[in-house]
Design a protein with these regions (language model features):
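DNA polymerase sliding clamps and clamp-related checkpoint/processivity subunits
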Residues: 1-26, 31-155, 163-256
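Polyanion-binding surfaces on beta-sheet-dominated domains and ring/shell assemblies
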Residues: 160
């Protein structure tokens, strides 16, 4: 911990939500630092070891049923260890994170109390980054359907080509013996919005996208933004809060 020596408390009323958030981070990185502050609530930012993808989590104070924090503080956590504990959390469990300078105590309540304690890692203080990319096209869609798209194509190739022209979004994969494509029209019921200042096309790693669909279970909608041969931005809104969400950035790879 870097900051106040007082205990910091975060209370989540829905166990499934906090479990999926932890899994979304652990899918990208083993260790990460998050910040808790009276102004911003909970903020996490971490770059994967290959520096190909970044994950960010934003949970404003209003997201929590209870939050106690005196001043901005940073905490380093081993998410691989934390996710093992969170796998025991049921959907209707109430989960508390109690943080000191040395430890994270996870309290799970549902008829009785379960307590687990993790030692903290040295934190690495950060400033929230946003990529300096002019995203020219995007689609906002039912988040539950994005995993269907990825799973449909993952057996075809190790890369996926995404293109958006404002009227349709196409997801394609091909190998020497097979080519598959999924087309989502602007008028399809899964689409909430689609736009393009100019058409965009880029290729991304399938393995990374597979790991980036974990928040779909706790999000009503996901927004994909892109530009030709530029990184992809995915944002999952969480809990009906405008500022709450899980965000990924994924670097593009060479063309197919």
């Amino acid at each position: 911990m870097s900051g106040s020596a007082e205990e910091v408390i975060l209370v989540f009323e829905e166990g499934k939500v906090v479990r999926k958030i932890v899994e979304a981070v652990e899918a990208m990185i083993e260790e990460a630092t998050f910040k808790v502050s009276p102004e911003e609530g909970f903020v996490l930012q971490a770059l994967d070891p290959a520096k190909i993808a970044m994950v960010q989590v934003f949970l404003p104070k209003s997201f929590f049923s209870e939050i106690q924090v005196a001043e901005e503080s940073f905490f380093g956590v081993n998410f691989t260890e934390l996710v093992k504990i969170m796998k025991r959390v049921k959907s209707d469990d109430r989960v508390e994170f109690r943080l000191t300078k040395d430890s994270l105590t996870i309290v799970i309540r549902n008829g009785f109390k379960r307590t687990h304690r993790l030692a903290l890692l040295p934190p690495e203080e950060f400033q929230v980054r946003s990529l300096k990319v002019n995203f020219t096209a995007g689609i906002r869609m039912d988040s539950k359907r994005l995993p269907d798209v990825i799973k449909e194509l993952k057996g075809v190739a190790s890369e996926i080509e995404i293109s958006i022209d404002g009227e349709k979004a196409e997801f394609g994969a091909r190998s020497e013996r097979q080519e598959s494509k999924i087309t989502i029209e602007k008028t399809d019921p899964v689409v909430l919005d689609m736009w393009a200042e100019e058409p965009a096309r880029a290729v991304y790693g399938m393995a990374y996208l597979e790991r980036m669909i974990k928040p779909a279970d706790i999000s009503a909608e996901v927004t994909l933004e892109m530009a030709t041969d530029k990184p992809l931005k995915l944002h999952y809104s969480i809990g009906g809060f405008a500022d709450a969400g899980v965000r990924y950035y994924l670097a593009n790879v060479s063309g197919m």
